[in-house]
């Protein structure tokens, strides 16, 4: 076994890398373990709200320099005309492939040790030390363990099902036809269809990210085939069908993930420190997953460096995010049911401002940002 580190961070996503950088910059001996050996894509909407942008800049990253593209509007469509409005806050889009690599590099520059290509298989606490067994058979040890494995659970540390556990997630990058790319513009478009919803938004390089959720039973009824799901979405949502007509997939097949505990929030400590999706899983339409991940990392660093334990951190984080996760989950439960979709679309036709209000209601609260040392007003300020 190698030396005993101050901190063991399992997971090289947004939460894990941000935490590793903060702790390493404070002089801690940090080992970050990431199962992927190189750059890779992940199932993620890739939406960066103003809160996420502030946290990234605090880490010394400039998302615009990395290629982030602005997202100015949001729309929702069903069988009829799309309802579109201006987002009440600044937002951007950046692929996880590019963002995560920049965060990993920043953590390494701060002094964290990166170990890539062998994820953790087990994590145990013995004699006051945390020990992890990696996929290559080696073992590592640390005084504190931070679980930041994203949507993937570690054996023995599985999260309980959330209020909405029956969804499958898919993601695919596309090159839209030039006319449809121009029509999409700087917007994130939410497309409803029986059994689920999809989000389409631009990312760097002139590409678009299609990320969607569908109820497991509906996907099974379609034969469990991606092509059948595509046909189903196009038949049920003319707006989405138009956007995707003639689009070129940039990957051989979509990424997929199951058993996501949407609506889950870790409200008490269980020994290790849980960050990001391991601590709170907000439904994808809200676009606040990366903000929560970054907030959890900064809060965990502040608590750890200030002498608090994992249980105190978990309670504070739950207090910050429970409300917005609950509200987003209620909306998401409506979005995958036919009657709920009809109710929402009817409400948007009568109250168009409700779309912007819903977007604003699923952001990190101002009090949480202040506790993170951020100015909430800056999260609402659009770049000059």
Provide a role label for each language-model segment.
Residues 1-15:
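Beta1/beta-strand and adjacent pyrophosphate-binding region of the FAD-binding site
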Residues 21-44:
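Glycine-rich FAD pyrophosphate-binding loop
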Residues 37-57, 71:
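Conserved N-terminal glycine-rich FAD pyrophosphate-binding loop of Rossmann-like flavoproteins
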Residues 53-104:
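A conserved beta-strand/loop capping segment in the N-terminal third of enzymes
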Residues 56, 290-307, 313:
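An active-site-proximal "capping" alpha-helix that borders the catalytic cofactor pocket
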Residues 106-240:
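Predominantly flavin-linked oxidoreductase catalytic cores and closely associated redox partners
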Residues 122, 139, 220-300:
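FAD/FMN-dependent oxidoreductases across multiple families
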Residues 302-384:
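C-terminal helical "tail/cap" subdomain of flavin- and related membrane-associated enzymes
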């Amino acid at each position: 076994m190698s030396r005993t580190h101050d901190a063991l961070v399992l997971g090289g996503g947004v939460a894990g890398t941000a935490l590793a950088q903060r702790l390493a910059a404070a002089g801690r001996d940090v080992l970050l373990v990431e199962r992927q050996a190189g750059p890779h894509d992940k199932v993620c909407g890739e939406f960066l709200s103003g809160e996420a942008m502030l946290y990234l800049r605090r880490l010394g990253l400039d998302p615009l320099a990395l290629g982030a593209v602005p997202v100015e509007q949001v729309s929702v469509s069903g069988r009829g005309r799309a309802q579109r409005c201006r987002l009440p806050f600044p937002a951007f889009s950046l692929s996880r492939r590019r963002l995560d690599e920049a965060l990993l590099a920043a953590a390494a520059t701060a002094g964290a040790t990166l170990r890539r290509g062998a994820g953790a298989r087990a994590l145990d606490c013995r004699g006051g030390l945390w020990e992890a067994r990696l996929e290559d058979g080696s073992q590592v040890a640390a005084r504190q363990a931070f679980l930041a494995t994203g949507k993937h659970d570690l054996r023995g540390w599985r999260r309980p099902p959330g209020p909405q556990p029956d969804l499958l997630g898919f993601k695919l990058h596309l090159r839209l036809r030039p006319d449809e790319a121009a029509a999409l513009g700087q917007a994130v478009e939410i497309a409803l269809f029986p059994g689920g919803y999809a989000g389409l938004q631009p990312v760097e390089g002139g590409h678009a990210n299609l990320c969607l959720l569908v109820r497991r039973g509906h996907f099974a009824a379609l034969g469990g085939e991606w092509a059948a799901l595509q046909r189903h979405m196009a038949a049920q949502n003319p707006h989405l069908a138009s956007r995707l007509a003639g689009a070129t997939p940039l990957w051989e097949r979509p990424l997929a993930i199951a058993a996501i505990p949407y609506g889950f929030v870790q409200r008490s400590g269980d020994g290790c420190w849980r960050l990001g999706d391991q601590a709170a899983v907000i439904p994808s339409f809200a676009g606040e997953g990366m903000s929560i991940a970054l907030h959890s990392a900064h809060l965990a660093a502040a608590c750890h460096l200030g002498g608090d334990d994992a249980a105190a951190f978990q309670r504070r984080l739950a207090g910050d995010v429970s409300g917005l996760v609950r509200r987003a989950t209620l909306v998401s439960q409506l979005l995958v049911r036919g009657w709920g979709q009809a109710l929402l679309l009817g409400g948007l036709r009568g109250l168009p401002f409700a779309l912007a209000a819903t977007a604003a209601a699923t952001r990190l609260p101002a009090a949480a940002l202040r506790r993170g040392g951020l100015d909430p007003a800056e999260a609402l300020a659009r770049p000059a």
